[in-house]
């Protein structure tokens, strides 16, 4: 059986006076109750990449199509690290610029000085501060980054000694931007492409991911994956939610073709 970990805990309110920190715990899509974190090959590959990058103080990229578990796996891995060393560059607005990155790093490190007023002074402060601790800069949704953001982080990484670890996590656009610039591409330590689950992986992982699928006939799992989910963790979460509602609606005590038909019509 594929090993599992406890379900993700609900978010906790921040302590009074604490610096603003995004909740970096892995969140199950749609808040699907009774879900379990499954140690799939994808999750283990992400863990190896993150740990190796952090230990090497390198820059790496984890990329692939949406819904395959890139962010979830990265968040699950960094939960085992000192949260004070994780610097997440998460933005509500799309297409952030270098100014946004500078200011977010300033806030995430909880610096007590006044925020510098010019890029030159700001970069000097960051070059002086980042080497003091083994920080890990996590750039999720990196496909939204402008090219100058990647260049800013590359120059910052180049000029820090010791260097921070930098993880780019995002869609293929992020990977393509990094690869299109020799100065950036030559500095990437690990390139990990995340692919959809194979049929064999689906048959192992899905029954362990949620109790509603335990004991379900393999042919039915294959049907759901072929007709809808296509190896995507996110799509499996959606169909699971609909299956649970379908069982309630139809008064069924197990997942069968009738429940699956009802669920797939809603997906």
Region spans (language model):
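Conserved NTP-binding/hydrolysis module of P-loop NTPases
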Residues: 26-27, 31, 96-115
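Conserved catalytic segments around the Walker B and adjacent sensor/switch elements
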Residues: 81-94
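Conserved AAA+ ATPase "SRH/arginine-finger" region at the nucleotide-binding site
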Residues: 91-92, 189-202
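Pre-Walker A adenine-sensing motif
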Residues: 41-54
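Short regulatory helix/loop adjacent to the ATP-binding pocket of P-loop NTPases
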Residues: 78, 174-189
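Pre-Walker A (Motif I) flank of P-loop NTPase domains
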Residues: 55-60
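Conserved P-loop NTPase "ATPase switch" module shared by AAA+ and STAND
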Residues: 126-149
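C-terminal alpha-helical "lid" subdomain
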Residues: 1-39, 48, 67, 72-79, ...
């Amino acid at each position: 059986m594929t090993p599992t970990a406890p379900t993700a805990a609900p978010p906790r309110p921040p302590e009074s006076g604490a610096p603003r920190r995004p909740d970096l715990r892995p969140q199950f899509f749609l808040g699907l109750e009774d879900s379990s974190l499954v140690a799939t090959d994808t999750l283990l590959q992400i863990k190896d990449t993150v740990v190796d990058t952090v230990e090497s103080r390198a820059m790496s990229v984890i990329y692939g199509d949406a819904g395959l578990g890139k962010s979830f796996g990265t968040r699950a891995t960094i939960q085992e690290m000192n949260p004070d060393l994780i610097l997440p560059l998460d933005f509500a607005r799309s297409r952030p610029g270098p100014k946004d990155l500078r200011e977010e790093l300033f806030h995430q490190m909880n610096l007590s000085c006044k925020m510098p007023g010019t890029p030159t002074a700001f970069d000097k402060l960051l070059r002086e501060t980042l080497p003091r601790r083994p920080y890990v800069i996590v750039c999720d949704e990196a496909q939204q980054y402008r090219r100058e953001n990647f260049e800013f982080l590359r120059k910052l990484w180049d000029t820090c000694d010791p260097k921070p670890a930098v993880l780019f996590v995002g869609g293929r656009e992020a990977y393509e931007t990094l690869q299109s610039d020799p100065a950036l591409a030559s500095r990437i330590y690990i390139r990990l492409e995340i692919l959809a689950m194979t049929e064999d992986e689906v048959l192992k992982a899905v029954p362990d991911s949620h109790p509603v699928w335990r004991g379900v006939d393999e042919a039915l799992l294959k049907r759901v994956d072929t007709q809808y989910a296509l190896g995507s963790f996110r799509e499996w979460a959606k169909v699971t939610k609909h299956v649970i509602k379908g069982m309630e609606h139809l008064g069924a005590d197990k997942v069968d073709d009738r429940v699956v038909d009802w669920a797939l019509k809603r997906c």
